[in-house]
A protein has these predicted regions:
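Alpha-helical scaffold/interaction cores of sigma-54-like transcription cofactors
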Residues: 1-562
Length: 562
């Protein structure tokens, strides 16, 4: 969406979903799901598309694929445009089976679900005889029903010459080789055609091209960015009754009270003027920027962790420059003592969401996340997805394998690729620069060149998705009102059972651009080790050391270390 806006292109937001008849009537061991193209015509349609995508994962996930049924489509059909689909659609599969009567019935069901005027019949030109056969029936049924055709391209790669790279990618996905592929496309026509190529391909049905413009004009979706969707914090009752009710204390007032208590606890009573002045300044900035609730939310789950005996880190990053965070015991680093700047953490001249990274013991991290989920509602809390891309080393090994070479062949080439620098792997462009070891090998050996040519076509492609190691999003409303969710494999628990988590379908940056509150719950094994060490000391001496009061200039300690 943002890329289109930046380049002056009107975005058309859509999703190819897997559609089934009825989740409730699904026969055991049998799963028939088909492709269906859905486009958002307006903001309501976009919200419904988000809901459908989420429900497909959260309610219809089976055998590694999400799916929605016709009842769900009808429930969320407002504002959607449905295209009859590619060869893998139910509509085309009926035609392939020589059952045009069933295809027509399915078309009627689609029109009932999203509205007659919102269904278009797809014709495609991909060089497959079965597609040409389907096109004849698609045209006939569309005209019988009085609905327009629309010319589409089933795009799987950008340029025609990318066909071979796509074939290699399919082999990577299916763990097969190019000589014996498990899945193959029979033509090289599944690329993104130019407008002239589309016009030439559908010259037989010029109305199919006109419909593409009609649909583009109908689709008008604006995604609101830059909001602050921070949940309200349930403050205690003030003059009236009930948290967050009519008599609830204002968030700013409650935060100020907690900071005042923290100032006395940290600096003594009376509070030193320097500390009071710094706290007043920070509270003013926090209030003006609308982040009172943010600090209360962080204070609350950190307090829960400490009250529950879960080890919490002393603070990391720019948040250590905040006296408010120090007084709330979010951090244990005195910014006055160490002359740390608040503006590095929260700058009134640059409006952006604050970012406090919290460290918890690995053993306790899940309990903290569970607490936050229960407090703000499981519909409003999720972990954030992350996408793993194919970088040169992995792409080289995969390319060698799909070409049928032994593992050692690809591994030898991969080892010629330099190590990542500050976490960033080098690109093939950098690896093939003059003087680089990989370039020399490619120039010397034809097999190496063939492998690297295939690997370059795989570079940058998303290989898999996983759960971000730390990031959790907390919303002021159900997340499916804002963005789609899915489930992700979180590995096995202590009993060996597979664990699945609800995660966002959007990665970190889009989540933040939508204005959602993102928190980092980092699990540090160091904290577990320290806790175990303190337990050993307590058992041996009867006293448990307080880490926050240990002297930093203890001579015997330094003598032991050096």
């Amino acid at each position: 969406f943002m890329a289109c806006q930046k380049r002056g292109i009107k975005p058309i937001i859509g999703c190819e979903v897997y559609i089934v008849d009825d989740h409730a009537r699904r026969a055991p061991g049998r799963l028939e799901r088909f492709h269906l193209t859905l486009l958002a015509a307006d903001p309501t349609g976009y919200r419904n598309l988000v809901k459908l995508s989420s429900r497909g994962f959260l309610e219809g996930y089976q055998r590694g694929k999400p799916s929605v049924d016709m009842a769900q489509l009808a429930e969320h059909g407002q504002g959607l445009i449905a295209l009859s689909g590619c060869l893998q659609s139910r509509f085309c599969q009926h035609l392939i089976d020589d059952r045009p009567d069933l295809a027509r019935t399915h078309a009627s069901e689609l029109m009932a679900a999203v509205g007659t005027d919102n269904v278009y019949f797809e014709v495609q030109k991909n060089g497959l005889p079965v597609q040409d056969k389907c096109n004849e029936e698609i045209v006939r049924i569309a005209r019988e029903l009085g609905r327009p055709l629309v010319g589409t391209g089933d795009v799987h790669y950008l340029r025609r010459e990318d066909y071979h790279h796509h074939a290699a990618l399919l082999c990577v996905q299916t763990k097969s080789t190019l000589s014996q592929p498990k899945i193959t496309f029979d033509t090289n026509e599944f690329y993104l055609r130019s407008s002239q190529e589309m016009a030439d391909a559908f010259a037989e049905w010029p109305e199919a091209i006109a419909s593409t413009l009609e649909i583009a004009e109908r689709c008008d979706v604006e995604i609101e960015l830059g909001r602050q969707l921070i949940p309200r914090y349930p403050t205690p009752a003030g003059a009236g009754e009930g948290a967050m009710g009519e008599g609830a204390m204002e968030e700013g007032e409650y935060l100020r009270r907690l900071v005042d208590e923290g100032l006395r606890r940290r600096y003594g009573d009376p509070i030193p003027a320097e500390a009071m002045e710094r706290a007043e300044y920070e509270l003013g900035v926090i209030d003006r920027m609308g982040f009172n609730a943010y600090f209360l939310i962080v204070w609350d789950f950190v307090k829960f962790a400490k009250d529950s005996g879960i080890a919490v880190g002393p603070g990391r990053g720019s948040a250590a420059g905040s006296i408010v965070a120090y007084c709330l015991q979010i951090t244990d680093v005195d910014p006055l003592r160490y002359d740390l700047l608040f503006e590095r953490f929260l700058n009134p001249e640059r409006v952006s969401m604050p970012d406090i990274d919290m460290d918890f013991s690995v053993r306790g991290r899940e309990r903290v996340i569970r607490y936050v989920t229960e407090k703000y509602g499981k519909e409003a809390v999720a972990q954030i997805i992350t996408f793993g891309k194919m970088f040169p080393r992995a792409a080289t090994r995969d390319a060698a394998r799909v070409l049928g070479h032994e593992y050692g062949v690809g591994d030898r080439l991969a080892k010629l690729i330099p190590d990542p620098i500050m976490g960033r792997p080098p690109s093939f462009e950098e690896c093939l620069a003059p003087g680089q070891p990989l370039r020399a090998e490619v120039d010397r050996d034809g097999t190496a060149k063939q492998i690297v040519d295939v690997a370059q076509g795989l570079e940058g492609i998303v290989r898999n998705s996983s759960i971000h190691a730390a990031a959790v999003v907390i919303s002021d409303r159900p997340l499916t009102d804002i963005m789609p969710l899915q489930i992700a494999d979180a590995g096995a628990d202590e009993n060996g059972e597979r664990v699945f988590r609800t995660v966002t379908q959007f990665s970190m940056k889009p989540v933040e651009q939508l204005g959602l509150l993102k928190m980092d719950f980092l699990g540090l094994r160091n904290l577990d080790v320290i806790e175990d060490a303190l337990d050993i000391v307590a058992r041996a001496t009867g006293e448990r050391p307080n880490m926050s009061t240990l002297p930093l200039d203890h001579p015997p300690t330094y003598e032991m270390l050096a």
